[in-house]
Each structure stands twice: as structure tokens, then as C-alpha cells.
Regions:
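Contiguous beta-strand segments within globular domains
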Residues: 52-75, 153, 233, 248
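Surface-exposed binding patches on compact interaction domains or structured appendages
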Residues: 5-51, 74-156
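Aromatic-lined carbohydrate-binding surfaces of glycoside hydrolases
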Residues: 159, 170-177, 185-315
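Short, solvent-exposed loop/edge-beta patches enriched in aromatic
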Residues: 61-65, 72-78, 161-165, 180, ...
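Extended acidic/polar, glycine-enriched regions
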Residues: 58, 70-88, 139-201, 229
Length: 315
């Protein structure tokens, strides 16, 4: 199966061959609401026996809630896209500007804990099969070409403004491809008369590590340049909006011996002078921390690390 690659996202080719027998009974594109708890396999029809055309969600004011739709098709679909309407309840409206759509994209992985020994440490790759698994929610790619005999998830997220009136809201998600409407799914949202505080007031201590070097490598831009920060802003805002409290700062070259695909470089420049004294330049560190704080992540800075795994010090 060919990889689905756009200028925004490079998807790996599927190492699992498509079994035509599984698609024999699928004679036309199928669209249904699915479950946010299921990672649908790319090479198999979705395990949905009766298409669900209506989704019922319940949320508080100020909450973000999501649903997943699924498209599976025996033929190529060009320019697949999802279009949402406003959600209305009488004269009250949740604007479609508060609704975000995205394609559920696939990443390559291997069998997890096949031998029962855990997932850390060296493993002989020949002993573990590789496959694609649904993981990334791609909000950037506007349309996608879906190959024949393949399945694609679509992620729909609704941000309910805190000032929203309680009630039952209804709207639609229209699935289009090749310039025509394939299906119109109904979305029902019951907004309760309770209000979730803004993320800045949440007590939960959310700490998801950030790697700005991965973004600069992926987009081939100078680390911590204006272009780099512009690219990171919508990405890191997702973390801030989820209630992120901690800034990840690497203050040493490869603190974990480069175990990640994109190594963490030092945000602090270490200089040892001829007279034996030390000078530390915090320019990059300051830029990064100020950037994250401006987005609302400001409770803690985790600095890695005074002693690196490899016991190798670069200066």
C-alpha cells in the first residue's frame, strides 16, 4: 500500500499487505461514526456492521470533547475532507470556528511486549513484526487521497466556550471526496449547566515532554529562529490548552545519550575559558522558556540534566 504523503505529513508505507478477501463484500465507500477508543487498522475494513449516522456527546461549558468518524473504501477517494456546520440549540449557537477536524494518521511500530520482557532496552528487530498504527491527529493537511481498500479515521473536536448556554445542540459533519458529498453525519451535543475552569486554573499537574528540535528537523528550519517559533506555536498551544504545566529544557548535549530519533541538544552553551573559568550562554534557553510561558505553560521548568546517561560532557 502506498504511503499517504503530503507537504505537511510523511506517512510510512504499510508493511502489512492488504488481504483482498477482507474487502470482497465492501462494494462502495462506507462512512460511519466510530469510537475514540479504537485505533482502526488501515489495511482492513472498519469492524462496524451497521453504519452509525448520529453521534451523541455530553460536555460541560468550557470543556473540549471529541468524536471519531471512519471512512473505509474499496476504491480510491481523492480530496477526502470533512466539513462541519455550526451547532445550534434554538437561538444559541456554538460556532464551527470552535470545531476542529483532523485526519487520524498512521505511524510505524512493532509488536509490543511480545516476549513479556517489557519494551525497554535492546531488541532484535527481526523477531518483531512491524505494522502501522493510528496515532497522530493531523489538523494541518486539508485534504487527503485515500487509496483503494483502506480505512481512514477522522477526528472531530469541539471546544465549548464557557459562556455557552446549556442545552442540546445539533449540527452536521459532511464527508466529501472527488467533489461530491459521500455522507452527512449528525452530531448531537448536550451541554450541561456546569462550567469547567480555564486550563490555567486546573490542579492536575500535566507534564508532557516537548522536543523543539524535532520540529526544526522536520520542517528543515534553523532552531529557535522566528520561523521555528512560528511553526511551534500552534503545536505547543495544544499542550498549553490541555493544561500543560511543565517546560522541558535540555541544558546538556544529548542528556539521554540520543535515545530519541531527534536528539535533545543543549539550550545552554557551555564555554570553558583559557584561564579555567566557565561561561554559560542562556540565550536559547531564555527564548524557549519565554515562548512557552507566553503560551501559558509556566508552573515548572524541568532541566535535563546535570549528569548525562553517557557521562559525556560537551563544551
Amino acid at each position: 500500500m502506498n504511503a499517504q504523503t503530503s507537504e505537511y505529513y510523511q506517512e510510512a508505507a504499510n508493511p502489512i499487505a492488504t488481504n483482498p478477501a477482507l474487502w470482497a463484500k465492501v462494494t462502495a465507500p462506507q462512512i460511519s461514526w466510530g469510537s475514540t477508543d479504537i485505533r482502526y487498522k488501515k489495511e482492513e475494513p472498519a469492524p462496524i456492521h451497521s453504519a452509525q449516522k448520529s453521534m451523541n456527546l455530553t460536555a460541560w461549558k468550557g470543556e473540549k470533547i471529541s468524536a471519531q468518524l471512519v471512512v473505509w473504501t474499496p476504491k480510491v477517494l481523492n480530496d477526502l475532507t470533512f466539513m462541519v456546520s455550526d451547532l445550534t440549540s434554538g437561538s444559541a449557537t456554538i460556532s464551527k470556528e470552535n470545531i476542529r477536524t483532523g485526519f487520524v494518521r498512521y505511524v510505524i511500530t512493532d509488536e509490543l511486549n511480545k516476549d513479556g520482557l517489557g519494551a525497554c532496552g535492546y531488541r532484535n528487530s527481526a523477531d518483531f513484526d512491524s505494522t502501522l498504527v493510528a496515532d497522530v491527529i493531523d489538523h494541518i493537511t486539508p485534504t487527503l487521497t485515500l487509496p483503494a481498500n483502506s480505512t481512514q479515521g477522522g477526528w472531530i473536536s469541539v471546544n465549548i466556550p464557557q459562556g455557552t448556554k446549556a442545552g442540546k445542540y445539533t449540527g452536521t459533519v459532511t464527508v466529501k471526496a472527488d467533489g461530491i458529498t459521500l455522507s452527512e453525519l449528525k452530531l448531537n451535543l448536550q451541554v450541561k449547566n456546569r462550567t469547567l475552569p480555564p486550563p490555567s486554573e486546573w490542579a492536575f499537574h500535566l507534564d508532557l515532554w516537548q522536543n523543539p528540535y524535532a520540529v526544526s528537523r522536520y520542517y528543515n528550519v534553523e532552531p529557535f529562529s522566528k520561523k521555528h517559533f512560528d511553526l511551534m506555536r500552534p503545536l505547543m498551544k495544544l499542550y498549553a490548552d490541555a493544561g500543560g504545566k511543565v517546560i522541558t529544557a535540555s541544558i546538556m548535549h544529548k542528556p539521554w545519550n540520543g535515545q530519541t530519533y531527534d536528539a535533545f541538544e543543549s539550550m545552554v552553551t557551555w564555554l570553558k575559558k583559557a584561564d579555567g573559568t566557565w561561561y554559560f550562554d542562556y540565550t536559547v534557553f531564555d527564548k524557549w522558556v519565554e515562548f512557552m510561558m507566553d503560551l501559558g505553560v509556566k508552573k515548572q521548568i524541568s532541566c535535563y540534566s546535570m549528569v548525562p546517561w553517557r557521562l559525556s560532557f560537551q563544551y
